[in-house]
Amino acid sequence: MKRTLALILLALGMHVQAATLTLNDAREQGRVGETLSGYIAPITHDAETLALVSRINAARTESYQKLADSNNLPVDEVAKMAGQKLVARAQPGEYVKGINGKWLKK
């Protein structure tokens, strides 16, 4: 009984993990796009996409802050430099937000 329960819980855990939306999946599905601010923004506003955007942007904020601190720069400047690179590196078919605030498909 315990073994069966453990196997069921393991299978459920793998299913949840496999179903978790990744940044690459969201980009490919047109659910998120890169912005010049250095952060991703949602294109679709479902709960799964919004949770991903929050997680990714929190991690980026932490990373930008560390870079800013080590280089004695404002965090906004670091984020904008990263944003320019991320927008430029977006793959064909992915969305980026232009300086006019509109989504463009590369």
Regions found by a protein language model. Give the residues of each.
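Anionic, Ser/Thr-rich low-complexity intrinsically disordered regions
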Residues: A19-K106
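Classic N-terminal secretory signal peptides
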Residues: M1-A18
